[in-house]
Amino acid sequence: MQVLSSLRSAKNRHPDCKVVRRKGRIYVICKTNPRFKAVQGRKKKR
């Protein structure tokens, strides 16, 4: 899963990609091609 600052290009990668909001984060999920998964707003690990 990619951590992106902007999901603008991620949601247009595949026709089946959907934008979902869960727990204050925004996810792009794609069931037909899971390599297009992405998330915006994740905390960085230090």
Curated annotation (Swiss-Prot):
SUPFAM superfamilies for the chain: Ribosomal protein L36 (SSF57840)
Entry-linked HAMAP family: Ribosomal_bL36
Keyword Ribosomal protein recorded: yes
Keyword Ribosomal protein: yes
Stated family: Belongs to the bacterial ribosomal protein bL36 family.
Gene Ontology CC entries for this record: ribonucleoprotein complex; ribosome
Keywords linked to the UniProt accession: Ribonucleoprotein, Ribosomal protein
A GO BP annotation: translation
Name of this protein: Large ribosomal subunit protein bL36
GO MF annotation terms: structural constituent of ribosome
NCBIfam families, sorted: PRK00831.1, rpmJ_bact
Pfam hit, one: Ribosomal_L36
